[in-house]
Amino acid sequence: LNIKKYNAPNLMSKCGGDMSRISDKEALNLIENEDLKILGERASAIKSELHPNKITSFCIDRNINYTNICWVDCKFCAFYRHEKDEDAYILSYDEIDTKIDELLAIGGTQILFQGGVHPKLKIDFYEELVEHIHTKYPQIDIHGFSAIEIDFIARISRITIKEVLERLQNRGLFSIPGAGAEILNERVREQVSPKKITNETWIEVHKTAHEIGMKTTATMMFGMTETDEEIIEHWRRIRDLQEITQGFRAFIMWSFQSSNTKLIEEHPEIKKQSANRYLRLLAVARIYLDNFPNIQS
């Protein structure tokens, strides 16, 4: 692969050169062998081709975790608590409002609103919560609830995923985040989060959201036990869905933070990911995910 000539298919009208879509094999070669400077230059060029005005945007937002109670027990997570733990919580409306007021004071426009997968909360709780926020703070975009939260709300409430999404959308939910994807490979998921939803269910939730006109983001957490091939499988799954729906507004990735997790106890060989590794994967993701308009960090 001559990376200096590579151009994504959706850039055909803007540039010349080899228009073929990058394959999994080519992506693996880039990860393993290509010079980081060349990767960065090509990824930056693709960004400039997609966004010729050379504007890089940002959003002032705030993470609000409405509960830390969760039954899924992911091995990579140091956040969750069980219902009877002393430091388990569900935020009150007043506590949520205080956090949003603090966000507004610094010019914020969005909340990333999610939590643990609470074993008892049903759709009515979430409808009332979203409606409260949207009614009191209509200027704030609610980017909330991961695919596993949506799936469990559907199951415990005995309704469909589509109904959950539509009901929350009607109350003010703007978009949903990509959390819960980690690595979309069943071997990895069985190892690090065996109680979590499957690849297919994560895809189904996002596809359903796109079908009702709700945008979402796609995410990836790397640096656990996955291989480079499994990272590329993850990218392929989200690229394939984007080809159908065009519903992802951005791709975001981050590295595994191992402190106080069960996963690092079970796999002490896991090493902290370097800045070079992050930049390498970020650049190849920009090249591979040719139908994603934005890479977010």
Language-model regions, residue ranges each:
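Flexible, acidic/Gly-rich N-terminal and inter-domain linker regions that tether
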Residues: 1-72
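Conserved short loop/turn motifs at secondary-structure junctions
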Residues: 27-30, 60-64, 115-119, 222-225, ...
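Amphipathic, non-transmembrane alpha-helical secondary structure
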Residues: 28, 37, 93-101, 105, ...
